Each structure stands twice: as structure tokens, then as C-alpha cells.
């Protein structure tokens, strides 16, 4: 079926014409919040979206990303609804002023804002992306490589090739959109 069409509605139509057995499984999902158990009303609902609806949903995600961007340029990384806090359950011992954060996902937030700017031309997105880039610059470590200054992103006591690669992509996308040369030094270093 995957070679015939990418449209879910067409795949369903093909399946309906194909001899097979189907079973309907009914389930319920719940989440705990403080002392309450709350039902979730989500599921895989079949929807067909227009390009405009997809764009609006993407922009709503970018708006949410901006809404939860901190003054230092970081984005909200983790929220625990049960405990109503921002402490990552995999890193519960981190101090409140230094909660766990992921530089790769940070770069994803920057690229999201740049894409929103490309779709709308709204400066709020590119300004948020710049704040995110400025935070990433603070994570840059420099070293000498063959007589030249090279750089990499160092965060959470480690350097990841993907972290440096993603910030390079984000900086280049930002530069292409704004012609702002303020990150050229870092682009060359990475």
C-alpha cells in the first residue's frame, strides 16, 4: 500500500476493498495529576488537513515555543504535570537553578522559529531565534586545530557532534534569512 499512495484516506479505502479480518480494540487512557486520576480524550483520529491548517498548527507550535522561551534564550525543556514542576524525572537531583537541558532540542527550537519566520515574515520569530542562538554561543568552547581556532558546543559535561552540527545549521539558516553577519565567526569555527 505504501507504494500506491501516501494519503491515509486512500490507504483506508484500499484496505476496505482487501479481504482481511479486523478487530476493534477499545481502551481508555488516564493521567494522574496530584491526587486525581483524569481521563484522556486523545487518540488517533483520522483527519485530512489542508496546507493552510498544517501551517496554522505549525505556527501555533512556534508561538508556544516563543511563549515559553526564557530571558537567557533557553526554551522550556520539561514539564511534569503530575508534580506541577519542571524537574526532569530522569535527572531529579539537579538543582532548581540548573535543571537538565538538551542542546540538540534547543537547536530544534531555534530552527522551528526560523521556519515560522520564513512562513510569516513576523519579526517575533526571528528575534526569538536570535535569543536562542545567543544562548548557544555561551556554550561554545574554543581550541586550536592545525593553527586555527575551532569551536564546538559543550553542555552537560559533554560535546556532541550533533550539537555542534545543529547549531551550525541554525546559524546558517538565520544568516540566510537576515543577512546578519554577527555569527559568522562561529559558523567558521564550527
What is the predicted role of each segment?
Residues 1-98, 104, 123, 130-131, ...:
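Low-complexity, Ser/Thr/Pro/Gly-enriched N-terminal "stalk/linker" regions
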Residues 70, 129, 133, 151, ...:
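Long, compositionally biased, intrinsically disordered segments
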Residues 46-51, 89-107, 148-167, 177-180:
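Solvent-exposed loop and edge beta-strand segments that line ligand/cofactor-binding
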Residues 62, 110-113, 133, 184:
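Extracytoplasmic/secreted envelope proteins and their assembly/folding machinery
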Residues 36-52, 107-123, 165-180:
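Well-ordered alpha-helical scaffold segments within catalytic/enzyme domains
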Residues 67, 115, 138, 142, ...:
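Positions within ordered alpha-helical repeat solenoids
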Residues 75-77, 117, 125, 135, ...:
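Aromatic side chains
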